Amino acid sequence: MFVSGEAIKFGGLDPKNAKVIVCHLGNGASVSAVKYGESVDTSMGLTPLEGLIMGTRSGDLDPAIISFLAEKEGMTASQVIDVCNKKSGVLGLSDGYSSDFRDLVQASETGNEQAKHALEAYAYRVGKYIGAYAAAMNGVDVIAFTAGVGENNAEVRAMIGEYIGYLGTNIDAERNKVRGEEIILSDEGSKVVTMVVPTNEELAIARKSAAIAEAGTDTYGNTFAK
């Protein structure tokens, strides 16, 4: 909610009417849909394994993969889950080359086809979730990139941008060169604003703690003296 709130302020929007998609893209990653100030969906499920392709996590898979690999490879369910968590994602798709997106971009630019494939699959999955959440909210006003990859990897942002142009946003190539700074990436003709919003988890925790202290009650209804 921190990033969506900052995106709304940066874009000069009314939080009661804004529809925001937050792409938290790091070694772990998720996409969230925030409608009128309330989170309505997120790509992660019971565990972080659901959703996007990540550094070492597979993201969405047919649950039958567990029984399939158990029978085919003689693996236990725990071993399959371990592979999905620690040996999959872009690491697996790049044939073990790297889970670091900087390495993958560099390798892709020098002709490593597996690294290129891993990045393309990653961007496709992010683009698919953005489209799904735009549909879920019946529109989107802002798409915000955040976290290590989202804030700093211009190449990955550009690849994702190729999948979301139909929404009415066009990422400006020059603006997209900026790394680690709050900036609007989309050009003036875009109907949907695409931006980078640096995350600040410490500030978010501090703000929430201050609000709880001021209210004298926490999220679960527990009260305490101010």
Q: Which residues does each predicted region cover?
A:
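Short, glycine-/Ser/Thr-/acidic-enriched flexible segments
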Residues: 27-28, 36-39, 98, 150-151, ...
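Beta-strand segments within the central parallel beta-sheet cores of soluble alpha/beta enzyme folds
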Residues: 17-23, 78-87, 142-144
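Glycine-rich phosphate-binding loop of actin/hexokinase-like ATP-binding domains
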Residues: 1-72
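Alpha-helical scaffold segments in soluble metabolic enzymes
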Residues: 2-10, 65-69, 79, 83, ...
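Conserved active-site and cofactor/substrate-binding residues in soluble primary-metabolism enzymes
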Residues: 2, 29, 60-64, 75, ...
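Internal helix-turn-beta structural module
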Residues: 116, 120-141, 150-224
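A mobile "lid/hinge" subdomain adjacent to the ATP/sugar-phosphate binding pocket shared
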Residues: 73-118
